[in-house]
A protein has these predicted regions:
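Bacterial N-terminal signal peptides that target proteins for export
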Residues: 1-7
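Bacterial N-terminal signal peptides
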Residues: 7-18
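C-terminal non-catalytic alpha-helical accessory regions
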Residues: 440, 444-445, 454-694, 698, ...
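Short, well-ordered secondary-structure micro-motifs within conserved domains or adaptor modules
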Residues: 51-76
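Catalytic-core regions of glycoside hydrolase
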Residues: 172, 192-196, 206, 211, ...
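Boundary of Sec targeting at the N-terminus
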Residues: 20-22
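Conserved, mostly hydrophobic/aromatic
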Residues: 93, 131, 166, 286, ...
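Feature activates predominantly on carbohydrate-active enzymes
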Residues: 24-26, 32, 38-41, 45, ...
Length: 725
């Protein structure tokens, strides 16, 4: 036999490996859903590293003992103690046991042998770390960018993967949002025609939600159902509503509220029935604003008490509560903040917390820097404007403030700036802060509609592309002292030692959207889309940010200086303090960081790994966008100086900077065109002068914006001094 020596060698090597494989017994001292999940995760990691699992403790090399919870450790805390051949993992509760087990799993996956495993302890910094997940059915906004996730989000395999990601990153709550969730979950006993599905279809929906809540419970993840208000199903309106004029069949947001008794009764009974039929659902949420026009803040609170709060009471069990702080102090759905509304809301929250069927603390939620928290860690505003101190003084005892960190700024490009997250957490370390929501309203992290067809990649779902985003936020909310080495090690585990520089590269390059959003003031979702360098234009359409708009737009961060204010001050022989980030300073920061990021990834060989190719490419895209912005800022300063002073060299300098900005934009296009599809984008759904159907066909890609980038050069070439106009 020609290959007999080779076969014998293979058998000898195989026997040697097997004989050296160490055996492990995993012991659950107090079996539960959570300990079973922890044991399964440990088992998977161990077998992947060629450890042999045993069902009995006799003659094994190692015993991993999952100890019963020890409340003295505190909620969600854990201890890993290694004594010789026994590793004991103890949690302050079931959640802590899972976290301790996952910390060991992480070591195993990173190649740490059980012999080298170190004892450790960890406890949570913030008790509430939630994902805001907008479901793709009966969505708040309407776009192909949301509808395309429908099938993915009806697949329990997707939810298993998403919940695994959540618990691995220490997120402990999943909040599910849509306009009117009830009729996807129940057939209301007294309003059966409100549900649009037949029995088989409804059973499929119910099976989905029960699976989500069951899997979340296994992972010690709380679940919240957060409907918008006041909405009913179209089928309810047609069958039962006695006032057809108030029928909101298309679920418009900014209309008068239907405060009829039948709608109150229907909503209340739906809440009760959902809580009774889904015992693993942890809590509910209140949102005050949409379809509540014509109502005062007090009337909105009263409606909530008569429906959702009373529905919770009638369910006959304890329920947790998220009370989203209202953003309108007027009878309009889009109002402004006020001290009076804050006082009214605080009183309502504290009265809810006193109810025996509500499990405290109540999470009182606010949007951090409106819809674009990926800007500055400094709190400048909330939805509706200024935040007063009513919710904080005196210090609340029955509720905690949670901050919603919205991401409406980057969906395609990967992101990761650990020091930004740490700074955010450090800025919100007050005793009244309970935690964070993290999520979007214009994006659902389900189907990957970005990646062009090609050779295989390591991800199936969109959120898996953004693993660093979730890992940074989740782990640093749990423990902000988690070192960068943890995140760098994940790059190395995935792609090998050459990827060890990627965390630093991302930290530098993906600071670009943070700096743009700090320098370019915004309000709601569509007002800024950082990865596209897009925002509201003068007509309130979403378009590429022109050099004129970059010049005149106020800044968000009070330490930043706009182009207009900078030129006005400098031409008047004024100056700025060292703490101020002027356009030239910002341009230099962008140039320095983005050039260094490009240098860090220049030598990484991606030819044999398409997934690594995308990771490196996104660093390059962010870096080139940052360099584009740096040139554009310098061009804007020169152009505005020319307009103010009439100095011709300033005009020529502006043209040269804007031409350089175009070259960097062309680099972005060259990188992204073969990698990314033309993408649907919710931000384009309400462009004025077009029908919804026309807007829904619009697609985003950097290549599509090139003509607008060229227009900046033409604008500079045709510019005239202000005095000559």
């Amino acid at each position: 036999m020609k290959n007999k020596p080779l076969l014998l060698l293979f058998l000898v090597v195989g026997l040697t490996v097997d004989s050296l494989a160490q055996s492990v017994f995993i012991q659950q001292t107090q079996p539960s859903r959570q300990s079973a999940y922890a044991a399964q995760q440990l088992a998977s990691a161990l077998t992947a590293k060629r450890y042999v699992l045993r069902s009995k403790s006799q003659s094994v090399d190692y015993t991993i003992r999952l100890e019963q919870p020890n409340s003295q450790l505190g909620p969600e805390a854990y201890a890993v103690d290694k004594q010789n051949k026994q590793i004991t993992i103890t949690g302050g509760d079931g959640r802590g046991l899972i976290y301790g087990s996952l910390s060991v799993v992480e070591d195993i996956q990173n190649g740490v042998a059980l012999a080298q495993l170190k004892s450790r302890r960890e406890q949570p910094h913030l008790p509430f770390r939630a994902i805001k997940f907008d479901l793709p059915w009966d969505t708040y906004r309407h776009s192909d960018a949301l509808d395309l996730h429908y099938d993915t989000c009806r697949d329990t395999l997707y939810w298993k993967a998403f919940l695994d990601m959540m618990v691995a990153n220490r997120f402990n709550a999943l909040s599910l949002w849509n306009l009117h969730p009830y009729t996807f979950m129940i057939r209301p006993t007294n309003f059966p025609a409100a549900t649009p599905f037949n029995d088989q279809q409804l059973a499929e929906w119910q099976s989905l939600f029960r699976a989500i809540f069951r899997m979340a419970n296994e992972r010690a993840i709380d679940t919240y159902l957060i409907p918008f208000n006041i909405f009913t199903s179209p089928e309810f309106s047609k069958a039962y509503n006695v006032n057809p004029k108030l029928n909101n069949l298309d679920h418009h947001h900014f209309i008068d509220g239907d405060t009829s008794e039948i709608v109150k009764r229907y909503t209340r009974e739906c809440v009760t029935q959902v809580l009774q039929e889904y015992p693993e659902l942890t809590g509910f949420g209140l949102t005050l604003g949409e379809a509540m026009g014509g109502m005062t803040p007090q009337q909105r609170e009263n409606w909530m008490k008569a429906t959702i709060i009373d529905g919770m009471r009638l369910a006959g069990r304890k329920t947790k509560l998220v009370h989203r702080i209202p953003f309108s102090s007027t009878t309009g759905s889009l109002g402004v903040t006020s001290i009076d509304t804050e006082k009214l809301t605080r009183k309502s929250i504290e009265s809810e917390a006193a109810l025996p069927f509500i499990e405290g603390p109540i999470w009182a939620d606010l949007k951090y820097n409106w819809s674009h928290a990926h800007s500055t860690p400094t709190l400048v505003k909330v939805h509706g404007g200024k935040l007063f101190d009513t919710y904080f003084k005196p210090d609340p005892t029955t509720y905690k403030i949670t901050w919603t960190v919205r991401n409406e700024d980057f969906f395609c490009l990967r992101w990761g700036v650990p020091d930004f997250v740490r700074a955010h957490v450090a800025a919100n370390n007050q005793s009244y802060v309970g935690g964070y929501f993290l999520g979007s309203e214009t994006y659902i992290p389900a189907k990957d509609y970005f990646t062009t067809p090609g050779s295989p990649v390591d991800w199936r779902y969109a959120f898996e592309r953004q693993w660093l985003f979730y890992k940074l936020w989740g782990r640093l909310l749990y423990n902000p002292t988690t070192p960068d080495a943890v995140f760098s090690a994940e790059f190395v585990r995935r792609y090998g030692s050459s990827a060890s520089r990627l965390l630093e590269a991302y930290s530098l390059a993906s600071s670009t959207p943070l700096r743009l959003a700090s320098a370019f003031d915004f309000t709601w979702d569509f007002s800024l889309y950082s990865e596209g360098m897009m925002g509201f234009d003068a007509n309130k359409n979403v378009s590429y940010i022109s050099v004129n708009q970059l010049t005149t737009q106020p800044t968000l961060d009070p330490n930043y200086v706009s182009v207009n204010d900078y030129v006005k001050t400098i031409t008047a022989s004024g100056s700025f303090g060292k703490e101020k980030i002027t356009p030239p300073v910002l341009a230099k920061m962008l140039e320095t960081d983005c050039q260094k990021a490009l240098q860090l990834v220049r030598s990484i060989n991606t030819s044999a790994n398409r997934s690594l190719l995308y990771e490196v490419a996104d660093v390059k895209v962010w870096a080139n966008l940052g360099l584009h912005l740096a040139e554009k800022l310098q061009g804007a300063v020169a152009l505005q100086t020319y307009r103010t002073t009439g100095q011709e060299p300033q005009k020529q300098e502006a043209i040269q900077h804007l031409k350089a900005a175009l070259r960097y934009w062309d680099d972005v296009v060259a990188i992204t065109r073969p990698l990314y599809n033309d993408m649907p984008l919710v931000h384009l759904a309400e462009q004025k002068g077009h029908t919804w159907e026309e807007n829904n066909k619009l697609r985003f890609h950097w290549a599509k914006l090139r003509p607008a980038v060229v227009k900046d050069i033409e604008l500079a070439e045709n510019a005239q001094p202000i005095s000559a106009k």
